[in-house]
């Protein structure tokens, strides 16, 4: 009888352990924050903007920057020389950079954040009791995420793919397109150039009405409906009305 009671006690303990383990596995990992409110998604979108830190290096590829070695400020040492390859349009500009070419990785990280906002913000809880205001904020954030994603892809395709030519765009490799939020480690193939630009245009066409119909006054460093329209016009100019 005593042994039977012990067995029953052990069985209860083991069952409790399994139940506890199941509950533990259902918990959100400590290194992953669960987004619930519109404010949470706005903060994530702000993080997607932070990759602007790599844009000064991109400016070196344009005519906006001049670099005169004789006038170099000695206080900065040879820091500017690290990016001289970009300024000179060397074939291997990453070789002199202290951290290599960061644009590709940082911009795809930014795209991942915009994907999360686009997929999930419709279920976000408002920080106020005003339902109409919550709906408006959701809509604007979603539109803003579409615009920012298009902006990132436009930069990437212009940096890592040949120029757009309507005659050859359907057979010219462009860049990978990722519209998912899963963290699966899988290879991505390069889409053809016309598909990349079609995705950019599609994102902007979704972004503009969402931001116009749900207008929210945001800081100047974030996308507005006018900025999205200007970006769409630029895309059409690049494509020479071939898309």
Region spans (language model):
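Aromatic-residue-lined binding/catalytic grooves and analogous aromatic/hydrophobic interfacial grooves
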Residues: 21-22, 226, 231, 235-243
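Short coil/linker segments at helix-helix boundaries
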Residues: 127-136, 159-194, 198
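Conserved, well-structured interaction surfaces
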Residues: 83-160, 191, 209-212
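Short coil/turn linking the two alpha-helices of tandem helical-hairpin repeats
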Residues: 157-164, 215, 238-242
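Membrane-proximal, proline-rich intrinsically disordered regions
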Residues: 21-70
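Bacterial Sec-dependent N-terminal signal peptides
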Residues: 1-31
């Amino acid at each position: 009888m005593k042994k039977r009671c012990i067995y029953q006690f052990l069985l209860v303990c083991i069952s409790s352990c399994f139940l506890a383990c199941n509950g533990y596995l259902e918990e959100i990992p400590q290194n992953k924050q669960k987004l619930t409110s519109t404010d949470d998604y706005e903060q994530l979108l702000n993080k997607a903007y932070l990759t602007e830190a790599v844009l000064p290096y991109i400016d070196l590829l344009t005519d906006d920057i001049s670099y005169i070695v004789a006038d170099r400020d000695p206080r900065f040492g040879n820091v500017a020389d690290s990016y001289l390859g970009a300024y000179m349009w060397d074939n291997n500009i990453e070789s002199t950079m202290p951290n290599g070419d960061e644009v590709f990785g940082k911009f795809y990280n930014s795209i991942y954040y915009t994907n999360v906002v686009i997929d999930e913000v419709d279920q976000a809880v408002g920080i106020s009791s005003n339902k109409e205001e919550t709906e408006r904020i959701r809509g604007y954030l979603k539109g803003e995420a579409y615009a920012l994603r298009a902006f990132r892809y436009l930069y990437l395709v212009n940096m890592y793919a040949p120029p757009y030519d309507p005659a050859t765009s359907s057979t010219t490799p462009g860049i990978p397109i990722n519209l998912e939020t899963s963290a699966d480690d899988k290879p991505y193939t390069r889409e053809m150039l016309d598909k990349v630009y079609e995705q950019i245009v599609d994102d902007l066409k979704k972004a503009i009405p969402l931001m116009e119909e749900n207008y929210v006054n945001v800081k100047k460093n974030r996308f507005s409906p006018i900025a999205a329209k200007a970006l769409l016009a630029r895309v059409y100019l690049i494509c020479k009305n071939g898309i």
